[in-house]
Amino acid sequence: MAHLPVSPEKLIEQFGPHLNYPPREGFAGRDEPDKAVKTHCCFCGMQCGIKLLVKNDKVVGFDPWEEFPFNQGRLCPKGVQRYMQNNHPDRILQPLQRNEGVGFTPVSWDEAMDKTVAEIKRIQEKYGKNAFSVLSGVSLTNEKSYLMGKFARVALKTANLDYNGRLCMVSAGAGNKKAFGLDRTSNTYADLEKAEVIIVAGANISETFPTLTHWVWRARDHGAKLIVVDPRVIPLARTADLHLPVKPGTDSALYGAILKYLADHDMLDHDFIDNHTTDFDKALAAVKDYTLEWAEEITGIEKAKIELAAQWWGKAKTSFLLHARGIEHHSKGVDNVLGCINIVLATGRIGKPYCGYGTITGQGNGQGGREHGHKCDQLPGNRDITNPEHRKYIAGVWGIDEKDMPGKGYTAYELIEAIHRGEVKGLLSICFNPLVSLPNNNYVREALEKLEFYVCIDFFMNETARHADIILAGSLQEEEEGTVTTAEGRVVRIRKAVNPPGHARSDTSIILELAKRLGAEDKFTYRNSEELFNELRVASKGGTADYYGITYQKIEDTMGVFWPCPTLDHPGTPRLWEDKKFATPDGKAHFNPVTYRDPGEITDEEYPIILTTGRVVSQYLSGTQTRRIGKLVDLYPEPKLEIHPELARKYGIKQNELVQVSTRRGTDEFPANIVETIRTDTVFLPYHWPGKKSANQFTPATLDPVSKIPEFKVCACNLKPLGVISPPSTASGAYASI
């Protein structure tokens, strides 16, 4: 039903992506703006401070916001181009309806809303409430994240709600809650500055979080040793004291061996372990056979390097461990996270100045968006939807009977499987491009084609939206008031700079109108985002992610408040666990036993090479926004297959030669980029592109049993040179790949 109404080429011609560039002389009004609005960048969890320059209700440029304490005016390539979206020619300016053989045609808001509500009611009356589903996104503000969770459960009354954080931070979140009872980085990044040893595991921060690199350099200036764990020699690794080129999928073996080494050489904080933790004996028993020799065989890292890393970590007085998707995008991502946490707890270096642990959030509101209830298993305040007391409390805040609160629904990829089985017939998506972001995306496309009705809220027509029946023209971050939460746990203000262009509306107003037409108006009476936030504060009160003491005014006065902040007179909590009282029922941090197991997909004779995926500096997630910005596309026009010279020689592959990549799920071709900065048994593709240039046409849908995150980082493949040299990337048009 939700097939493309016309060819992809015609849709691209009509709605893009098209590239836009600023005029050489800058946009009119850049030098004499009406106002400079202090807000934040939308492109990663750092949420760097930035000033947007506005003239005649249009964003015409930016200035650095040097006073904001995290980035202090610094911006990455994406940050300096983020202002190019507001006036982009691809903006959706009015509601659109599928028109077979034509594409999409404009309709009035009443027509679009009437059609959407009628289809929701039809599907739910015919198949049941859970037959209609919602996929949300964590680039939404805290207010909109909260609103989407409430809308799905109160207005739609469906259990089937999930979000694209399921593809990002959920393994870290599950590990943090198991170990600490709370899901947040333990310290501000300023604590990095005087750490003696820093481990950066599976986090290409120089390209994906460039402004964070500053704090690592500050530590290096003070003599810190830097250890980088990554199968590639990422830019940060080129300057590191020690690079551990781990074989993709073997991270838990590395951290298990380090834990055993720390114990064997008595590099432990016995007082901390004895008085403030549990289950150290179980964690140690799980790794009793994890010798350095065994770890070398499993991980491919020389045992001398593993030993040196363990010695540096064990002997340090202060340390910081950071990780991101490189260890989390696995079918054992939660285990990898817990393996890292175990070596932090073993040395007792948490809850102290310059000692910390944290996961780096990749999406624009990756931290706040995973706290307030648009996950299938979560209620606001990071509460558990299966916990009777949690359900009762939130039902009271929402003014509904607890028995009317839906239960746990499907996670993002499970939802796609449910569509295939015919359980789910309708979908509303916002801020999510699953056709590019989910693994095995040909299967995802087939699911979209089985839907009876699909409505999308977005400001650009992304690849998934091309399958929609109705598209509702939504808003950019700077077109609404709100808050987001940085990767440090700092709640900051998003300030409205301009109105949505044309007949586009704010995301919030769209959802409120849908709720009204679905008969739930009395539960959605917010007049502005601050009223939404104030209800969120109450809903979070007493939860582990407690925002109750945070107000818009307090944020204005301080440039951000760190949660938990349980009372109005509480200053916030920049550094967790200083009192050694953890958020677990017994008040202690919990070690967790982690045993190594193979990835969900292993290499064999037919598919002997490991394919891993990741990001590049100029692109963001599925590329919906960044593949439309000319200067960002110029930096990296199309995905290339990174391959080591030794592996290239083995297969007879030349630089820029087209290479056929084959996996158990599909085959396509990419130009080769021969580099020495990758393991000899591994190739790399960035995942920001759709269609024939998509890395996720190859990735398996093997899910972590706890977090349900897909295994994006390990895929078995084979290579075949095609004997054709690829044309220059700038001429390829891959940014608009079908």
Where are these predicted regions, by residue range?
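N-terminal export/assembly segments and adjacent metallocofactor-ligating motifs
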Residues: M1-M267, E302, P388, V397-M405, ...
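Long, contiguous, secondary-structure-rich segments that constitute the structural scaffold
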Residues: H3-L4, P8, I12-Q14, P501, ...
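N-terminal leader/propeptide and maturation segments of large enzyme subunits in energy/redox metabolism
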Residues: N99-P106, H265-K303, P380-D404, V498-T573, ...
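Glycine/threonine-rich flexible loop motifs
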Residues: I205-H214, P434-Y443, G482-T485
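Catalytic-core regions built around general acid/base machinery
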Residues: L212-H222, N440-L451
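Flexible glycine/proline-rich, aromatic-decorated loop/lid segments
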Residues: R232-P235, F460-R495
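A glycine-rich, hydrophobic/aromatic-adjacent loop/helix-cap motif
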Residues: G314-E417, E488, D522, L568-G572, ...
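Long, low-complexity segments enriched in small/aliphatic residues
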Residues: G369-C376, E531-K631
